[in-house]
């Protein structure tokens, strides 16, 4: 029994090191089909600046940013419920403002199932809410 516990802790430690050392994906990486989009009256260049400055908070870290593509890659750290996520924030000009599309992908590549999807959707929605709050203050 003690041997099983020790082996389990070693496996969790190895996965944690793998996830912590994993670099942000390339700027053009597809982070999956599940996306959330919302419109805003803020121009695309200002939305990009807000998304790029969002990692000033303790929750997110800037992975990559490309103003020409209107894309920011953010990441967050591990928690008790997840190994952390990579987020892509795509900003596109639209009539009367811009459209922001957010997607998320787990840092640990071998995760699937309804519980994982629910946690990923909740994490993505948390980022969407943070962006909306920052944009409301930026107008």
What spans do the regions from the language model cover?
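Ser/Thr-rich, low-complexity intrinsically disordered terminal regions
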Residues: 4-8, 12-139
């Amino acid at each position: 029994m003690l041997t099983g516990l020790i082996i389990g802790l070693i496996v969790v430690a190895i996965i944690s090191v793998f996830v912590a050392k994993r670099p942000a994906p390339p700027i053009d990486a597809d982070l999956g089909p599940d996306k959330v989009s919302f419109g805003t009256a803020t121009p695309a260049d200002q939305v990009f600046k807000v998304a790029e400055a969002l990692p000033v908070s303790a929750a997110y870290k800037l992975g990559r940013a490309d103003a020409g593509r209107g894309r920011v890659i953010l990441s967050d750290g591990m928690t008790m419920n997840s190994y952390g996520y990579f987020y892509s924030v795509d900003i596109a000009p639209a009539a009367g403002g811009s459209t922001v599309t957010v997607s998320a992908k787990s840092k640990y590549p071998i995760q699937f199932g309804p519980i994982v999807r629910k946690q990923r959707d909740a994490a993505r929605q948390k980022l969407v809410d943070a962006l909306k709050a920052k944009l409301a203050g930026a107008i």
